[in-house]
Regions:
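A short, N-terminal "cap"/entry segment at the start of jelly-roll beta-barrel domains
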Residues: 1-40, 124-130
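Glycine- and acidic-residue-biased ligand/ion/polar-headgroup-sensing regions
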Residues: 61-63, 67-72
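Short beta-strand His + acidic residue motifs that chelate non-heme Fe in jelly-roll/DSBH
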Residues: 55-56, 74-75, 91, 97-103
Length: 130
């Protein structure tokens, strides 16, 4: 990593990946975060392998995402989108969203505000129980 008074430069290979607890075959790297003294935004990279998924959930903060490789079905609210390398996504705060890999590795950058976040899993109503 190369640090200067004016910023931080690092290679993705220098950043430890951490399994996403609620995900399947999903790793998150915080490329730019609080330890880098970023005050407005954090930059994260997610890599999802074969069979990778993240369940329907909400976040307290919005997400801006850019797909680097692979393809996935991404649910945002009530709509399902098939996204692939080159697609950009905006997920507003509080909107339920999920991911299901269809072409691994599904690799994307995710920018979030430098604010406290909370993740909440969303359960869908079971029509059999209604």
């Amino acid at each position: 990593m190369h640090e200067t008074r004016d910023g931080v430069v690092k290679h993705v290979g220098q950043v430890e990946g951490v399994e996403v607890p609620s995900g399947t075959a999903t790793v998150r790297q915080v490329l730019i975060g609080p330890e880098d003294e970023a005050h407005n935004f954090f930059l994260r990279r997610f890599t999802m392998g074969e069979g990778g998924s993240m369940p329907l959930h909400t976040n307290r903060v919005e997400h801006e995402q850019y797909v680097l490789s692979g393809a996935a079905r991404v649910r945002i609210g009530d709509r399902v989108h098939e996204v692939r390398a080159g697609n950009a996504l905006f997920i507003p705060a509080g909107v339920p969203h999920s991911y299901e890999v269809i072409e691994p590795p599904f690799d994307f950058l995710c920018i979030v505000p430098a604010q406290p976040d909370a993740v909440a899993l969303v359960e869908l109503a079971d029509p059999e129980r209604s």
